[in-house]
């Protein structure tokens, strides 16, 4: 998630800096896999249909409604051009972004899905406190809340609150299931985004318990990008942003080109690719 979805560092597997996957979820077999592939391709009606099919056959799985909520969030991101790399490459652009005009119907559906997912995840964790699937779903719930608060409504402090909740669940999840590489994005984003703040701000954020190490955050994002599942394409986009901030334009081009090839119906990647000099 843009600022909401950022852990602990165990044994890091070695991988080449340019070995990002090009078929992370497109070849998936389940309705959830197909739904995420459709979402990243901006085919939102198909994504909702796949997620609805999953919810019908798996009514107690919180991953159904939270994934459907993600499709609603990406609908708003696409409508409002939230995922424009220029917004994140320039601090002044980001700080002056302001509140955006929301779609009330999309917001209502988004919140309804998140409430359902949170309810199912909490119920599952009541019966099985180490339910990895429920913890991951709740990590996504709070990450999506953070994204909406920060990127749509311009409420940074509310977003930080949800980011911390997402990060805590992700840390707990990774102690139980360290192979769930998607979860590293939650902690990595918190570390990376907040680590870019000026030193006095980082110090104050650290007092609140926020993780503020940009270098470690980037390593977490790289792990999700290279070995994640549902969130790998999103992590790759964020790494492209990080590369641009580091003036590594060739690296950004490589990542965006692979995303454009993988998701040809999404014009975002090609559009951003054309902007890189």
Describe the residue ranges of each PLM region.
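Bacterial N-terminal signal peptides
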Residues: 1-11
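Sec/Tat signal peptide C-region and signal peptidase I cleavage site
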Residues: 12-16
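Short coil/linker segments at helix-helix boundaries
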Residues: 17-34, 38-50, 60, 71-130, ...
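Residue-level recognition of tetratricopeptide repeat
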Residues: 61-62, 131, 180, 231-232, ...
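Canonical tetratricopeptide repeat
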Residues: 67-68, 137, 186, 238, ...
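Flexible, glycine-rich surface segments
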Residues: 219-238, 242-255
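A cross-kingdom marker for long, charged
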Residues: 241-277
């Amino acid at each position: 998630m843009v600022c909401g979805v950022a852990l602990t560092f165990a044994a890091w597997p070695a991988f080449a800096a340019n070995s990002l996957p090009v078929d992370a979820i497109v070849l998936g077999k389940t309705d959830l896999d197909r739904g995420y592939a459709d979402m990243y391709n901006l085919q939102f009606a198909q994504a909702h249909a796949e997620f609805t099919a999953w919810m019908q056959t798996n009514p107690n799985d919180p991953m159904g409604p939270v994934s459907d909520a993600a499709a609603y969030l990406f609908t708003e991101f696409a409508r409002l051009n939230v995922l424009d790399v220029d917004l994140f490459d320039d601090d002044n652009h980001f700080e002056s972004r302001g509140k955006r005009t929301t779609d009330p119907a999309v917001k209502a559906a988004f919140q309804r899905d998140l409430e359902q997912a949170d309810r199912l995840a909490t119920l599952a964790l009541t019966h099985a406190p180490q339910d990895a699937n429920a913890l991951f779903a709740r990590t996504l719930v709070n990450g999506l809340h953070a994204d909406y608060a920060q990127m749509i409504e311009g409420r940074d402090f509310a977003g930080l609150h949800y980011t911390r909740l997402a990060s805590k669940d992700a840390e707990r999840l990774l102690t139980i299931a360290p192979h769930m590489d998607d979860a590293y994005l939650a902690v990595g984003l918190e570390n990376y985004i907040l680590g870019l703040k000026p030193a006095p701000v980082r110090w104050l954020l650290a007092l609140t318990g926020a993780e503020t190490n940009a270098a470690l955050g980037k390593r977490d994002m790289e792990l999700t990008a290279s070995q994640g599942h549902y969130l790998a394409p999103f992590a790759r986009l964020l790494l492209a942003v990080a590369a641009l901030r580091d003036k590594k334009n060739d690296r950004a081009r490589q990542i965006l080109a692979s995303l454009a090839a993988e998701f040809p119906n999404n014009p975002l990647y090609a559009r951003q690719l054309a902007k890189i000099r």
